[in-house]
């Protein structure tokens, strides 16, 4: 682990953008983050999960920003809040990938609140994914599509309205 990313800096990289395609590690527990990330990014789960369990002590955007701020990072870091991460944090992993579950009004308000907190902490906006080919890892919901793909247009509309009000970005991969 070399947080300064000196090799990247030597190659002229000045900014690293993370949290795209609905996958961030801001809100959800370590095991859920590993399930979201490892298969999509082809990084072995047996390496990612122990590292997350050891080092991920945050569960809010404020704590995440504080974690990043305390490290001597070489490049600038900017991040999106991943929609799959947001859905898992609010609905739990199982409901977030249940095609029959529709978020309640309270669920949607909770998502909006967490997105607003992330924007307040300097995150760029929300990233989402509508491509059903990216799959979860782990043994609990393995091979189901990412949680963002299960969102209704109503859910997207509610979150996008907040992004528009705040002048924030909605990054998405199309189907």
Locate the predicted segments by residue.
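Divalent-metal coordination cores built from histidine and acidic residues
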Residues: 2-112, 117, 121-125
